Design a protein with these regions (language model features):
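Residues in flexible loops and secondary-structure boundaries
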Residues: 72-73, 236, 541, 547, ...
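Membrane-embedded and interfacial regions of multi-pass energy-transducing membrane proteins
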Residues: 2-518, 536
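Juxtamembrane boundary at the C-terminal end of a transmembrane helix
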Residues: 550-565
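Intrinsically disordered, low-complexity cytosolic tails and juxtamembrane linkers
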Residues: 519-523
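Juxtamembrane cytosolic/matrix-side boundary and N-terminal portion
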Residues: 524-544
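Final/C-terminal transmembrane alpha-helix of multipass membrane proteins
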Residues: 349, 428, 538-554
Length: 565
């Protein structure tokens, strides 16, 4: 058994247990590799959906789209989230990692599964999209890879829970766990439900692919699979909001406005957030109207309430901390004088606004049973989830990486001037990408069809010029975002390869108290800051007004399709 050691970061005061630190580095590094693969594949997707270029042949397009979706939505994000779980438990609670050997087994299963799945897709026999709906079948190794990955991720979640038990037993913290750790617990609980759902439905599908099971009912498959496919985004929501609170503490020394309320919002996520999966099933005939109405109204309102709480609490915490430093002029001096040149802060704040205004509002609209019919299975849907997964989650993870490069990887960032602008290029390009994609979807452009012009089809359809314009803008904005993602890869990998090695800090056989003056203190503490945040309240009211306006605009759109005379 490897001896337990703790390395104290001289820049933050955070302490990294040796085994946990190696696992964080391994999971985060592999995550970035899959982000790179998915980003390269995105070039093919974007240039094919751009009508003026229409690059790839149909077979190649669906192969590339399958790999892009799985690598980005599953492998990149979950590998990174496992690293976040280990950080939120071992580092923030200053304890040893439970069962490091089993944690390495989990990592190996995830890596083998991800590689197996990618090989199956690139061999050309598994272009079934990420959803892989039955009875359309992929190669057995496609399903086997996903199952191995799911099992590994589940094991990693239980290692995280075990680490919480270790911290409690060894009394490495007093009182409640920090809010960031509480948010990570929320993400892990949702992850167990989500990943288990994926494994439950993929196992019989795998057996069907090898001939041991005759049939998997398509409606059962869709219902259970979406408990995995969409609920994986709910893991992301809990994880990236936890990181928002972490960055507020790191950048400003901020505490949540009310820790109890923020924890209550995370609890609402556990109870209700994954029910948002229902919007994918609203056109399915096998589910009752009552089930659809309850899931898309009453239950969804609790999840929306939780998100509104975080929408006020995260910027509010930053505002309170800034006002305590004397930045009290008007509503927004605290925001104007925030560290906009720091990519850790700018990445998070761009992610926060984009996730709320683009992903959140569009998600509530899509989750309303009647309104969903306007945009169901149109390209509006990927416009929405790029606003949540790419703007909200991926940009947040990028911002956290800039913090972790010197702290966890112990490397000085190369080209900090370029890093300063990367969140703006990536984030604002994705803002525009999502907006025009949702606009094209509102006009009815198909979600996945290789050729929006339906060339050669017996029954063609002539889209309005605005639809072609918007899809062209999707291509331009998408390529700009890919450049922004490439800059992130260059800075991250380049810093690991060529960045100056930084002082590792002292190593000791046990954890030690964090000095009060260090940034890690705020990250590991508990407590509330108060409610004096008029600027954040004003921003929240603007968000609410935008939400109400857009919601009723879509009811107007819906009324226009009713005429039958």
């Amino acid at each position: 058994m490897t001896a337990v050691t703790y390395r104290t970061c001289p820049r933050t005061g955070l302490q990294f247990e040796g085994n946990a630190e190696k696992l964080m580095i391994a999971n985060a590094f592999v995550a970035v590799v899959f982000l790179l693969i998915g980003g390269i594949l995105a070039i093919g997707v974007v240039l094919t959906r751009w009508p003026a270029i229409h690059w790839l042949a149909a077979d190649t397009f669906y192969q590339v789209l399958t790999a892009h979706g799985i690598d980005m939505l599953i492998f990149w994000i979950i590998f990174f989230e496992i690293a976040v779980l280990y950080f939120a438990s071992s580092t923030l609670l200053r304890c040893r990692l439970a069962t490091p050997n089993i944690a390495w087994l989990a990592f190996a299963l995830m890596l083998i599964g991800a590689i197996t799945n990618n090989v199956a897709v690139f061999q050309g026999s598994s272009s079934v999209m990420m959803t892989s709906y039955v009875p359309m079948m992929a190669a057995p190794s496609f399903y086997l890879g996903l199952i191995l990955f799911a099992v590994g991720a589940l094991i990693a979640c239980f290692v995280f829970f075990g680490t919480l038990v270790v911290a409690k037993r060894e009394k490495t913290y007093e009182g409640s766990v920090p809010l960031v750790t509480f948010g990570a617990i929320t993400a892990a609980i949702i992850a167990v439900f989500t990943i288990a759902s994926g494994a439950i439905i993929l196992i019989p599908t795998f057996l069907m692919s090898v001939g041991l099971v005759k049939e998997v009912d398509p409606l059962v498959y869709r219902t259970v699979w979406w408990a995995f496919g969409h609920s994986s985004q709910q893991i992301n929501v809990a994880a990236h909001i936890s990181i928002w609170y972490a960055v507020a503490a790191i950048a400003f020394g901020a505490k949540p406005m009310s820790e109890r309320v923020s924890r209550g919002a995370f609890l609402l996520y556990i109870l209700f957030l994954q029910l948002a999966s229902a919007h994918h099933l609203l056109a399915d005939p096998g589910l009752s109207t009552g089930w659809k109405v309850v899931n898309t109204s009453y239950f969804m309102y609790f999840a929306v309430l939780a998100s509104m709480i975080h929408a006020l609490s995260v910027p509010g915490a930053m505002e309170v901390a800034q006002r305590q430093k004397g930045l009290t002029k008007g509503l927004f001096e605290w925001l104007r004088k925030a560290p906009w040149g720091n990519p850790v802060f700018s990445g998070v704040i761009i992610a926060l606004f984009g996730f709320g205004f683009l992903g959140g509002i569009s998600g509530v609209m899509m989750g309303t049973e009647q309104l969903n019919m306007i945009i169901h299975n149109t390209i509006y849907v990927p416009g929405h989830f790029h606003a949540t997964v790419v703007v909200g989650t991926t940009l947040t993870f990028m911002a956290l990486t800039y913090f972790l490069l010197p702290v966890l990887f112990r490397r000085e960032m190369i080209n900090p001037g370029l890093a300063k602008y990367q969140p703006y290029l990536f984030g604002l390009s994705m803002y525009f990408f999502c907006l025009v994609m949702m606009g094209a979807g509102t006009l009815g452009v198909s979600r996945r069809h290789w050729d929006m012009a339906l060339s050669g089809a017996a029954l063609g359809y002539e889209w309005p010029g605005a639809a072609y314009l918007m899809m062209g803008l999707v291509g331009i904005a998408g390529m700009a975002a890919i450049v922004g993602g490439g800059i992130y890869i260059y800075i991250t990998v380049g810093s690991l390869l060529w960045g100056k090695k930084l002082d590792s800090g002292a190593v000791s056989p046990r954890f030690t108290p964090v000095p009060q003056a260090m940034p890690g203190t705020a990250l590991q503490s508990t407590g509330s800051s108060g409610f004096v945040a008029p600027g954040s309240f004003a921003l929240t009211m603007v968000f609410l007004a935008a939400f109400v306006l857009y919601y009723f605009i879509n009811w107007k759109y819906l009324s226009q399709v009713w005429g039958l005379s």
